[in-house]
Protein backbone atom coordinates (compact mmCIF):
# COMPACT_ATOMS: atom_id res chain seq x y z
CA UNK A 1 0.00 0.00 0.00
CA UNK A 2 1.45 3.37 -1.00
CA UNK A 3 1.66 6.06 1.69
CA UNK A 4 0.24 8.70 -0.65
CA UNK A 5 -2.44 7.93 -3.19
CA UNK A 6 -1.40 9.48 -6.52
CA UNK A 7 -5.02 9.94 -7.55
CA UNK A 8 -5.75 11.93 -4.38
CA UNK A 9 -2.86 14.28 -5.14
CA UNK A 10 -4.17 14.82 -8.68
CA UNK A 11 -7.70 15.44 -7.38
CA UNK A 12 -6.47 18.01 -4.84
CA UNK A 13 -4.45 19.82 -7.53
CA UNK A 14 -7.49 19.75 -9.80
CA UNK A 15 -9.66 21.14 -6.97
CA UNK A 16 -7.33 24.13 -6.56
CA UNK A 17 -7.32 24.75 -10.31
CA UNK A 18 -11.10 24.48 -10.57
CA UNK A 19 -11.48 26.85 -7.60
CA UNK A 20 -9.32 29.48 -9.33
CA UNK A 21 -11.21 29.12 -12.60
CA UNK A 22 -14.53 29.19 -10.76
CA UNK A 23 -13.58 32.34 -8.83
CA UNK A 24 -12.70 34.12 -12.06
CA UNK A 25 -15.85 33.10 -13.90
CA UNK A 26 -18.26 33.61 -10.98
CA UNK A 27 -21.34 31.84 -9.62
CA UNK A 28 -23.72 32.59 -12.48
CA UNK A 29 -21.31 31.32 -15.10
CA UNK A 30 -20.18 28.56 -12.74
CA UNK A 31 -23.62 27.14 -12.03
CA UNK A 32 -24.52 27.11 -15.72
CA UNK A 33 -21.10 25.62 -16.47
CA UNK A 34 -21.76 22.88 -13.91
CA UNK A 35 -25.17 22.14 -15.39
CA UNK A 36 -23.61 21.80 -18.84
CA UNK A 37 -20.65 19.75 -17.57
CA UNK A 38 -22.79 17.34 -15.56
CA UNK A 39 -25.47 17.21 -18.25
CA UNK A 40 -23.00 16.30 -20.99
CA UNK A 41 -21.35 13.71 -18.76
CA UNK A 42 -24.66 12.14 -17.73
CA UNK A 43 -25.80 11.85 -21.34
CA UNK A 44 -22.57 9.99 -22.15
CA UNK A 45 -22.93 7.74 -19.08
CA UNK A 46 -26.50 6.88 -20.10
CA UNK A 47 -25.71 6.15 -23.74
CA UNK A 48 -22.39 4.27 -23.40
CA UNK A 49 -23.91 0.99 -22.06
CA UNK A 50 -26.43 0.94 -24.93
CA UNK A 51 -23.75 1.57 -27.55
CA UNK A 52 -21.39 -0.96 -25.93
CA UNK A 53 -24.01 -3.74 -25.99
CA UNK A 54 -24.71 -3.09 -29.68
CA UNK A 55 -21.11 -3.19 -30.88
CA UNK A 56 -19.68 -5.96 -28.67
CA UNK A 57 -20.40 -9.46 -27.47
CA UNK A 58 -22.24 -9.29 -24.13
CA UNK A 59 -19.72 -11.57 -22.49
CA UNK A 60 -16.69 -9.51 -23.49
CA UNK A 61 -14.53 -8.45 -20.59
CA UNK A 62 -13.67 -4.77 -20.79
CA UNK A 63 -10.01 -4.00 -21.52
CA UNK A 64 -7.95 -1.11 -20.17
CA UNK A 65 -8.07 0.58 -23.59
CA UNK A 66 -11.87 0.46 -23.69
CA UNK A 67 -12.11 1.90 -20.17
CA UNK A 68 -9.78 4.78 -21.10
CA UNK A 69 -11.84 5.47 -24.24
CA UNK A 70 -15.06 5.45 -22.20
CA UNK A 71 -13.62 7.93 -19.69
CA UNK A 72 -12.35 10.20 -22.50
CA UNK A 73 -15.77 10.13 -24.20
CA UNK A 74 -17.44 11.16 -20.93
CA UNK A 75 -15.00 14.03 -20.39
CA UNK A 76 -15.37 15.24 -24.00
CA UNK A 77 -19.19 15.18 -23.81
CA UNK A 78 -19.08 16.95 -20.44
CA UNK A 79 -16.74 19.60 -21.86
CA UNK A 80 -19.01 20.21 -24.86
CA UNK A 81 -21.98 20.70 -22.55
CA UNK A 82 -19.90 22.98 -20.35
CA UNK A 83 -18.75 25.14 -23.27
CA UNK A 84 -22.33 25.67 -24.42
CA UNK A 85 -23.75 26.69 -21.03
CA UNK A 86 -20.65 28.75 -20.11
CA UNK A 87 -21.26 30.88 -23.19
CA UNK A 88 -24.80 31.57 -21.95
CA UNK A 89 -23.48 32.35 -18.46
CA UNK A 90 -20.95 34.89 -19.72
CA UNK A 91 -23.71 36.77 -21.47
CA UNK A 92 -25.77 36.89 -18.27
CA UNK A 93 -22.82 37.90 -16.03
CA UNK A 94 -22.27 41.14 -17.93
CA UNK A 95 -25.41 42.43 -16.24
CA UNK A 96 -23.90 42.04 -12.70
CA UNK A 97 -22.21 45.41 -12.00
CA UNK A 98 -22.62 45.97 -8.21
CA UNK A 99 -19.21 45.28 -6.52
CA UNK A 100 -20.45 43.32 -3.41
CA UNK A 101 -22.57 41.17 -5.66
CA UNK A 102 -19.56 40.42 -7.84
CA UNK A 103 -17.55 39.26 -4.75
CA UNK A 104 -20.33 36.88 -3.72
CA UNK A 105 -20.63 35.78 -7.33
CA UNK A 106 -16.89 35.02 -7.56
CA UNK A 107 -16.78 33.09 -4.25
CA UNK A 108 -19.84 31.07 -5.18
CA UNK A 109 -18.26 30.30 -8.53
CA UNK A 110 -15.17 28.78 -6.87
CA UNK A 111 -17.30 26.58 -4.60
CA UNK A 112 -19.62 25.39 -7.36
CA UNK A 113 -16.73 24.55 -9.68
CA UNK A 114 -14.93 22.41 -7.08
CA UNK A 115 -18.13 20.55 -6.15
CA UNK A 116 -18.83 19.83 -9.83
CA UNK A 117 -15.32 18.49 -10.39
CA UNK A 118 -15.56 16.19 -7.37
CA UNK A 119 -18.98 14.88 -8.44
CA UNK A 120 -17.72 13.98 -11.91
CA UNK A 121 -14.59 12.38 -10.39
CA UNK A 122 -16.83 10.37 -8.04
CA UNK A 123 -19.06 9.29 -10.94
CA UNK A 124 -16.15 8.01 -13.03
CA UNK A 125 -14.39 6.59 -9.96
CA UNK A 126 -17.48 4.63 -8.89
CA UNK A 127 -17.41 2.81 -12.21
CA UNK A 128 -13.64 2.25 -12.25
CA UNK A 129 -13.68 0.96 -8.65
CA UNK A 130 -15.52 -2.16 -9.80
CA UNK A 131 -12.92 -3.10 -12.40
CA UNK A 132 -9.91 -5.37 -11.97
CA UNK A 133 -7.64 -3.03 -13.94
CA UNK A 134 -4.11 -3.11 -12.51
CA UNK A 135 -2.97 0.04 -10.67
CA UNK A 136 -5.84 2.26 -11.88
CA UNK A 137 -8.63 0.29 -10.20
CA UNK A 138 -6.66 -0.05 -6.98
CA UNK A 139 -5.78 3.67 -6.86
CA UNK A 140 -9.47 4.53 -7.26
CA UNK A 141 -10.60 2.08 -4.56
CA UNK A 142 -8.01 3.46 -2.12
CA UNK A 143 -8.81 7.14 -2.76
CA UNK A 144 -9.55 9.02 0.46
CA UNK A 145 -10.95 11.99 -1.49
CA UNK A 146 -13.50 9.88 -3.38
CA UNK A 147 -14.35 8.01 -0.18
CA UNK A 148 -15.12 11.37 1.44
CA UNK A 149 -17.38 12.38 -1.46
CA UNK A 150 -19.24 9.05 -1.32
CA UNK A 151 -19.91 9.52 2.42
CA UNK A 152 -21.54 12.91 1.80
CA UNK A 153 -23.82 11.57 -0.95
CA UNK A 154 -27.03 9.60 -0.24
CA UNK A 155 -26.60 5.89 0.48
CA UNK A 156 -28.38 4.91 -2.75
CA UNK A 157 -26.04 7.06 -4.88
CA UNK A 158 -23.96 4.01 -5.82
CA UNK A 159 -26.98 2.61 -7.68
CA UNK A 160 -27.74 5.72 -9.74
CA UNK A 161 -25.60 4.71 -12.71
CA UNK A 162 -25.49 0.95 -12.26
CA UNK A 163 -25.73 0.19 -16.01
CA UNK A 164 -22.58 2.21 -16.70
CA UNK A 165 -20.72 0.70 -13.73
CA UNK A 166 -21.72 -2.83 -14.73
CA UNK A 167 -20.57 -2.24 -18.32
CA UNK A 168 -17.04 -1.31 -17.21
CA UNK A 169 -16.84 -3.88 -14.41
CA UNK A 170 -17.53 -7.05 -16.41
CA UNK A 171 -15.31 -9.59 -14.69
CA UNK A 172 -17.73 -12.51 -14.35
CA UNK A 173 -17.97 -12.03 -10.56
CA UNK A 174 -20.08 -9.81 -8.30
CA UNK A 175 -18.48 -7.01 -6.31
CA UNK A 176 -17.90 -8.00 -2.70
CA UNK A 177 -17.20 -4.50 -1.37
CA UNK A 178 -18.62 -1.04 -2.01
CA UNK A 179 -16.58 1.35 -4.17
CA UNK A 180 -13.74 3.08 -2.27
CA UNK A 181 -13.77 0.44 0.48
CA UNK A 182 -10.37 -0.96 1.34
CA UNK A 183 -10.31 -4.71 0.76
CA UNK A 184 -8.99 -6.31 3.97
CA UNK A 185 -6.56 -9.08 2.97
CA UNK A 186 -5.09 -10.95 5.94
CA UNK A 187 -1.71 -12.55 5.35
CA UNK A 188 -1.61 -16.30 5.99
CA UNK A 189 0.77 -19.01 4.84
CA UNK A 190 0.18 -20.66 1.46
CA UNK A 191 -2.40 -23.48 1.24
CA UNK A 192 -1.29 -27.08 1.69
CA UNK A 193 -1.05 -28.50 -1.88
CA UNK A 194 -1.70 -32.05 -0.60
CA UNK A 195 -5.35 -31.11 0.00
CA UNK A 196 -5.99 -30.92 -3.75
CA UNK A 197 -4.97 -34.58 -4.10
CA UNK A 198 -6.89 -35.86 -1.09
CA UNK A 199 -9.48 -38.68 -1.36
CA UNK A 200 -12.03 -36.23 0.07
CA UNK A 201 -11.75 -34.00 -3.00
CA UNK A 202 -12.19 -36.96 -5.34
CA UNK A 203 -15.18 -38.29 -3.39
CA UNK A 204 -16.86 -34.87 -3.49
CA UNK A 205 -16.86 -35.02 -7.30
CA UNK A 206 -19.96 -37.27 -7.13
CA UNK A 207 -21.88 -34.40 -5.50
CA UNK A 208 -20.49 -31.43 -7.44
CA UNK A 209 -22.14 -30.50 -10.73
CA UNK A 210 -21.44 -28.28 -13.70
CA UNK A 211 -24.34 -25.87 -14.24
CA UNK A 212 -25.03 -24.59 -17.77
CA UNK A 213 -27.89 -22.55 -19.19
CA UNK A 214 -28.81 -19.99 -21.85
CA UNK A 215 -30.01 -16.55 -20.80
CA UNK A 216 -32.11 -15.04 -23.63
CA UNK A 217 -32.11 -11.58 -22.01
CA UNK A 218 -28.43 -11.15 -22.84
CA UNK A 219 -27.96 -13.93 -25.42
CA UNK A 220 -25.30 -15.61 -23.30
CA UNK A 221 -24.54 -19.18 -22.30
CA UNK A 222 -23.82 -19.09 -18.57
CA UNK A 223 -21.67 -21.71 -16.88
CA UNK A 224 -20.71 -22.32 -13.29
CA UNK A 225 -20.56 -24.85 -10.50
CA UNK A 226 -23.15 -26.19 -8.08
CA UNK A 227 -23.40 -28.94 -5.50
CA UNK A 228 -26.08 -31.27 -4.20
CA UNK A 229 -27.08 -30.30 -0.65
CA UNK A 230 -30.33 -32.30 -0.37
CA UNK A 231 -31.96 -35.03 -2.50
CA UNK A 232 -32.59 -33.58 -5.97
CA UNK A 233 -31.53 -30.07 -4.85
CA UNK A 234 -28.51 -28.17 -6.18
CA UNK A 235 -27.14 -24.95 -4.71
CA UNK A 236 -25.25 -22.46 -6.89
CA UNK A 237 -24.86 -18.69 -7.26
CA UNK A 238 -27.73 -16.54 -8.48
CA UNK A 239 -25.41 -14.89 -11.02
CA UNK A 240 -24.73 -18.34 -12.57
CA UNK A 241 -28.41 -18.78 -13.52
CA UNK A 242 -29.58 -15.16 -13.82
CA UNK A 243 -32.07 -15.05 -16.71
CA UNK A 244 -31.78 -18.80 -17.35
CA UNK A 245 -35.10 -20.59 -17.80
CA UNK A 246 -33.95 -24.19 -18.19
CA UNK A 247 -30.57 -24.90 -16.57
CA UNK A 248 -28.92 -28.29 -16.95
CA UNK A 249 -26.54 -29.99 -14.54
CA UNK A 250 -23.89 -32.64 -15.07
CA UNK A 251 -22.46 -34.72 -12.23
CA UNK A 252 -18.71 -34.24 -12.06
CA UNK A 253 -18.92 -32.29 -15.32
CA UNK A 254 -19.24 -35.56 -17.27
CA UNK A 255 -21.89 -37.78 -18.78
CA UNK A 256 -25.64 -37.29 -18.72
CA UNK A 257 -27.25 -33.84 -18.62
CA UNK A 258 -30.10 -33.44 -16.13
CA UNK A 259 -32.79 -30.79 -16.60
CA UNK A 260 -33.49 -28.54 -13.66
CA UNK A 261 -35.53 -25.49 -12.72
CA UNK A 262 -34.77 -22.52 -10.48
CA UNK A 263 -36.88 -22.80 -7.30
CA UNK A 264 -35.07 -20.19 -5.18
CA UNK A 265 -33.43 -17.02 -6.47
CA UNK A 266 -31.79 -14.85 -3.81
CA UNK A 267 -30.23 -12.06 -5.87
CA UNK A 268 -29.16 -10.10 -2.80
CA UNK A 269 -27.06 -12.87 -1.24
CA UNK A 270 -26.20 -14.32 -4.68
CA UNK A 271 -27.64 -17.79 -4.05
CA UNK A 272 -29.92 -19.95 -6.21
CA UNK A 273 -31.37 -23.42 -5.68
CA UNK A 274 -32.23 -25.76 -8.55
CA UNK A 275 -34.73 -28.58 -8.35
CA UNK A 276 -33.43 -31.56 -10.37
CA UNK A 277 -35.85 -34.45 -9.64
CA UNK A 278 -34.01 -37.12 -11.63
CA UNK A 279 -30.60 -36.33 -10.17
CA UNK A 280 -29.30 -39.25 -8.13
CA UNK A 281 -26.23 -37.98 -6.34
CA UNK A 282 -25.18 -37.95 -2.68
CA UNK A 283 -25.67 -34.68 -0.83
CA UNK A 284 -22.83 -32.74 0.76
CA UNK A 285 -23.39 -31.69 4.36
CA UNK A 286 -22.84 -28.16 5.64
CA UNK A 287 -20.58 -28.04 8.68
CA UNK A 288 -21.73 -26.55 11.98
CA UNK A 289 -18.17 -25.45 12.74
CA UNK A 290 -16.90 -22.02 11.72
CA UNK A 291 -13.62 -21.72 9.86
CA UNK A 292 -10.93 -19.73 11.63
CA UNK A 293 -8.08 -17.76 10.14
CA UNK A 294 -5.49 -20.19 8.68
CA UNK A 295 -8.00 -23.08 8.50
CA UNK A 296 -7.39 -25.52 5.65
CA UNK A 297 -10.05 -25.69 2.94
CA UNK A 298 -10.65 -26.92 -0.62
CA UNK A 299 -12.13 -25.13 -3.65
CA UNK A 300 -13.64 -27.52 -6.21
CA UNK A 301 -15.51 -26.81 -9.43
CA UNK A 302 -15.33 -26.27 -13.17
CA UNK A 303 -13.38 -23.07 -13.89
CA UNK A 304 -13.55 -21.65 -17.41
CA UNK A 305 -16.04 -24.35 -18.47
CA UNK A 306 -13.34 -26.98 -18.06
CA UNK A 307 -13.14 -30.34 -16.34
CA UNK A 308 -13.33 -30.97 -12.60
CA UNK A 309 -10.66 -28.88 -10.89
CA UNK A 310 -9.56 -28.96 -7.26
CA UNK A 311 -7.42 -26.31 -5.54
CA UNK A 312 -6.11 -26.15 -2.01
CA UNK A 313 -7.22 -23.10 -0.06
CA UNK A 314 -6.60 -21.44 3.27
CA UNK A 315 -9.05 -19.19 5.10
CA UNK A 316 -7.64 -15.68 5.54
CA UNK A 317 -10.47 -14.46 7.75
CA UNK A 318 -14.19 -13.85 8.17
CA UNK A 319 -15.64 -10.50 7.10
CA UNK A 320 -18.97 -8.69 7.17
CA UNK A 321 -18.72 -7.24 3.66
CA UNK A 322 -20.85 -4.30 2.54
CA UNK A 323 -21.23 -4.25 -1.23
CA UNK A 324 -23.71 -4.07 -4.10
CA UNK A 325 -26.13 -6.88 -4.85
CA UNK A 326 -25.65 -8.65 -8.19
CA UNK A 327 -27.92 -6.17 -10.00
CA UNK A 328 -26.50 -3.06 -8.28
CA UNK A 329 -29.97 -2.16 -7.00
CA UNK A 330 -28.74 -1.50 -3.49
CA UNK A 331 -26.12 -2.29 -0.86
CA UNK A 332 -26.18 -5.57 1.04
CA UNK A 333 -24.14 -6.97 3.92
CA UNK A 334 -22.78 -10.48 3.46
CA UNK A 335 -21.03 -12.78 5.93
CA UNK A 336 -18.07 -14.07 3.91
CA UNK A 337 -14.82 -15.99 4.20
CA UNK A 338 -11.78 -14.39 2.62
CA UNK A 339 -9.63 -17.14 1.08
CA UNK A 340 -6.05 -17.64 0.01
CA UNK A 341 -7.08 -19.53 -3.13
CA UNK A 342 -7.20 -19.45 -6.91
CA UNK A 343 -10.77 -18.63 -7.93
CA UNK A 344 -11.63 -18.34 -11.62
CA UNK A 345 -14.77 -17.82 -13.67
CA UNK A 346 -16.71 -21.06 -13.50
CA UNK A 347 -15.82 -21.68 -9.84
CA UNK A 348 -18.85 -19.59 -8.91
CA UNK A 349 -21.41 -21.60 -6.95
CA UNK A 350 -19.01 -24.35 -5.96
CA UNK A 351 -18.56 -25.57 -2.39
CA UNK A 352 -15.79 -24.45 -0.07
CA UNK A 353 -14.98 -27.84 1.43
CA UNK A 354 -13.54 -28.70 4.83
CA UNK A 355 -10.64 -31.20 4.88
CA UNK A 356 -13.13 -33.91 5.89
CA UNK A 357 -15.53 -33.20 3.01
CA UNK A 358 -18.21 -31.02 4.58
CA UNK A 359 -19.16 -27.54 3.31
CA UNK A 360 -17.84 -24.34 4.89
CA UNK A 361 -19.69 -22.16 2.40
CA UNK A 362 -20.33 -21.23 -1.24
CA UNK A 363 -17.62 -19.73 -3.47
CA UNK A 364 -18.95 -16.61 -5.21
CA UNK A 365 -16.28 -14.00 -5.99
CA UNK A 366 -12.62 -13.12 -6.33
CA UNK A 367 -10.55 -10.16 -5.24
CA UNK A 368 -10.16 -7.13 -7.51
CA UNK A 369 -6.74 -6.41 -5.98
CA UNK A 370 -5.08 -9.77 -5.31
CA UNK A 371 -5.09 -12.75 -7.72
CA UNK A 372 -4.57 -15.13 -4.78
CA UNK A 373 -7.71 -14.08 -2.92
CA UNK A 374 -11.26 -15.33 -3.37
CA UNK A 375 -14.47 -15.14 -1.37
CA UNK A 376 -17.11 -17.59 -0.17
CA UNK A 377 -20.46 -16.99 1.51
CA UNK A 378 -20.39 -18.68 4.92
CA UNK A 379 -22.74 -21.51 5.87
CA UNK A 380 -24.38 -19.16 8.37
CA UNK A 381 -25.03 -16.61 5.60
CA UNK A 382 -26.87 -19.12 3.41
CA UNK A 383 -28.67 -20.96 6.24
CA UNK A 384 -32.09 -19.49 5.37
CA UNK A 385 -31.65 -20.40 1.70
CA UNK A 386 -30.72 -23.97 2.69
CA UNK A 387 -33.89 -24.29 4.76
CA UNK A 388 -36.21 -22.79 2.12
CA UNK A 389 -34.48 -24.43 -0.84
CA UNK A 390 -34.87 -27.95 0.56
CA UNK A 391 -38.67 -27.73 0.43
CA UNK A 392 -39.14 -25.56 -2.67
CA UNK A 393 -40.34 -27.19 -5.88
CA UNK A 394 -42.12 -24.37 -7.75
CA UNK A 395 -40.30 -22.51 -10.50
CA UNK A 396 -39.41 -18.90 -9.66
CA UNK A 397 -38.35 -15.98 -11.84
CA UNK A 398 -34.58 -15.89 -12.35
CA UNK A 399 -34.91 -12.31 -13.64
CA UNK A 400 -32.11 -11.34 -16.06
CA UNK A 401 -28.37 -11.56 -16.61
CA UNK A 402 -26.53 -10.11 -13.66
CA UNK A 403 -22.90 -9.80 -14.81
Residue ranges, per PLM feature:
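Alpha-helical transmembrane segments and their juxtamembrane interface "caps"
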Residues: 1-193
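Short loop/turn motifs at secondary-structure junctions and domain boundaries
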Residues: 11-12, 216-219, 341-344
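A conserved glycine-rich beta-strand in the N-terminal activation segment of trypsin-fold
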Residues: 25, 194-199, 207-231, 257-259, ...
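Generic structural signal for well-ordered beta-strand positions
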Residues: 29, 235, 360-361
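Sec-exported extracytoplasmic/periplasmic mature domains
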Residues: 56, 93, 112, 129, ...
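Conserved active-site neighborhood of the chymotrypsin/trypsin-like protease fold
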Residues: 215-223, 230-309, 393-398
